[in-house]
């Protein structure tokens, strides 16, 4: 039993909780520094030649579960430990402190008040007029007063004792919501070209929402850099005949029945070409990381046997489309909806470039719990700033004086400066 009490005391120690917060913050930083949720091979290949921090390679990242920090067993264990520490701290310290603060302490002797942090003695008539005046004045100032013959006890700001418990409760709810969202939520990143649809399935495998991208636009600055992306979406629920229209843009997500759709990225999906008098050909584009961060293109043969291919590359939907041969020599530069250019004897015209919208779809069931926990934490933090003040007064008819003492859990100096004004309100002449 003694060992269990020591263990509980160690777990609920404030220094342990602060240490856990530091470790959790450091772990969260790791999750920010290392890409999360990518394929296993991407870590093995990406960190084989250039280990993170010089020594953390892909195998170590996978073993330590750094590829999914926020759902790793050790990170969840840290959150559980911190939550247990907060619960034990509230149970062992904050709750007894609140119960003690709710109980009235009846000081009956002047010598008891002299041992308090703040103590004053003022002259007083032989009767209890000063105590009556003090009780009435404290009532007017919002104090709770318990008066007995020849003495009184008063307190104010007792609600501040609830603050730390609410902070602990809010943090626990916030962590529960975060864990619930990590384990029970869904996340999908998808590139959609205009006119393409995405069927979202429920747990039973049935479609519960059809999402169609009707239009996608990229707003650019005068230098050609993208500033804003806008996606026009149609959302159709099963059994409904009419789709609902919504727009999603950067920093303006769509929230729909627990699903949040973010405008996360953009890409180039396809290019429409006309070779000579051929029909319009819509060909898919792919990225070329070896040519740059945002370079798309395709390899186009110029002969029926596939020989003498040329590379068409571009960096935006507005072009230009650069044409290179196998030696890297630029053969032509084309613009969407622009004139035809002859490449190796073949007239080539770029009709249009089709951009794709990068959408991030998230379903996080823990978000309401996170918001509630955050709100409770804010309220608890505000209440914790309220000082709990306690005041006692004991009359001394024989010496015609009144002994006053007080306690305060924060800003004791402010309470000490306020006390003389409280006493001056009941008698114009006071002695210290």
From Swiss-Prot:
Which ranges form a coiled coil? none
> Which keywords does UniProt give here?
Cytochrome c-type biogenesis, Membrane, Thylakoid, Transmembrane, Transmembrane helix
Q: Does this UniProt record's set of keywords contain Thylakoid?
A: yes
Membrane protein topology class: Multi-pass membrane protein
Instruction: Name its cellular compartments.
Output: Cellular thylakoid membrane
* Regions crossing the membrane: 14-34, 72-92, 162-182
Please name the Pfam families in this protein's record.
Answer: ResB
Superkingdom of the source species: Bacteria
Record has Transmembrane helix as a keyword: yes
Q: Name one GO biological process term.
A: cytochrome complex assembly
Please provide, in alphabetical order, the Gene Ontology terms of the cellular component aspect for this entry: plasma membrane-derived thylakoid membrane
Which PANTHER family does UniProt cross-reference here? CYTOCHROME C BIOGENESIS PROTEIN CCS1, CHLOROPLASTIC
Q: What's its job? A: Required during biogenesis of c-type cytochromes (cytochrome c6 and cytochrome f) at the step of heme attachment.
Q: What is known about its subunit structure?
A: May interact with CcsA.
Q: Name the family the entry cites.
A: Belongs to the Ccs1/CcsB family.
UniProt name for this protein: Cytochrome c biogenesis protein CcsB
Its source organism is Prochlorococcus marinus (strain MIT 9303)
């Amino acid at each position: 039993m003694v060992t269990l009490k020591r263990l509980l005391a160690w777990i609920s120690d404030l220094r342990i909780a602060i240490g856990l917060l530091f470790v959790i913050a450091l772990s969260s930083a790791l999750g920010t520094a290392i890409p999360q949720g990518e394929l296993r091979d991407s870590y093995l290949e990406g960190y084989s030649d250039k280990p993170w921090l010089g020594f953390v390679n892909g195998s170590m990242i996978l073993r330590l579960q750094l590829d999914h920090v926020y759902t790793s067993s050790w990170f969840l264990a840290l959150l559980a430990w911190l939550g247990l520490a907060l619960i034990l701290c509230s149970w062992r310290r904050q709750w007894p402190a609140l119960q003690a603060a709710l109980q009235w302490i009846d000081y009956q002797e002047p010598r008891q008040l002299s041992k308090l942090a703040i103590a004053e003695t003022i002259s007083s008539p032989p009767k209890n007029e000063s105590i009556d005046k003090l009780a009435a004045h404290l009532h007017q100032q919002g104090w709770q007063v318990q008066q007995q013959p020849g003495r009184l006890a008063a307190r104010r700001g007792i609600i501040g004792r609830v603050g730390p418990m609410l902070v602990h409760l809010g943090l626990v709810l916030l962590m529960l919501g975060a864990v619930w969202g990590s384990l029970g939520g869904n996340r999908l990143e998808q590139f959609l070209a205009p006119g393409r649809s995405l069927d979202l399935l429920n747990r039973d495998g049935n479609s519960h929402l059809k999402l169609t991208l009707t239009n996608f636009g990229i707003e650019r600055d005068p230098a050609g850099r993208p500033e804003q992306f806008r996606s026009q979406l149609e959302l159709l629920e099963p059994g409904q005949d009419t789709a609902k229209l919504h727009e999603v843009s950067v920093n303006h997500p769509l929230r729909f029945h627990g699903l949040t759709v973010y405008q996360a990225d953009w890409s180039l999906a396809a290019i429409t070409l006309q070779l000579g008098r051929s029909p319009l050909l819509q060909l898919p584009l792919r990225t070329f990381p070896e040519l740059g961060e945002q370079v798309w293109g395709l390899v186009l043969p110029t002969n029926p046997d596939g020989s003498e291919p040329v590379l068409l590359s571009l960096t935006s939907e507005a072009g230009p489309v650069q044409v290179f041969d196998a030696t890297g020599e630029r053969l032509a530069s084309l613009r969407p909806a622009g004139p035809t250019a002859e490449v190796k004897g073949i007239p080539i015209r770029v009709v249009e470039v089709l951009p794709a919208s990068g959408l991030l779809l998230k379903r996080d069931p823990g978000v309401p719990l996170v918001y509630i926990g955050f709100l409770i934490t804010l309220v608890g933090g505000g209440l914790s700033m309220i000082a709990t003040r306690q005041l006692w007064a004991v009359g001394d008819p024989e010496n015609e004086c009144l002994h006053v003492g007080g306690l305060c859990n924060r800003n004791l100096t402010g309470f000490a400066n306020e006390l003389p004004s409280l006493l001056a309100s009941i008698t114009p002449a006071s002695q210290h």
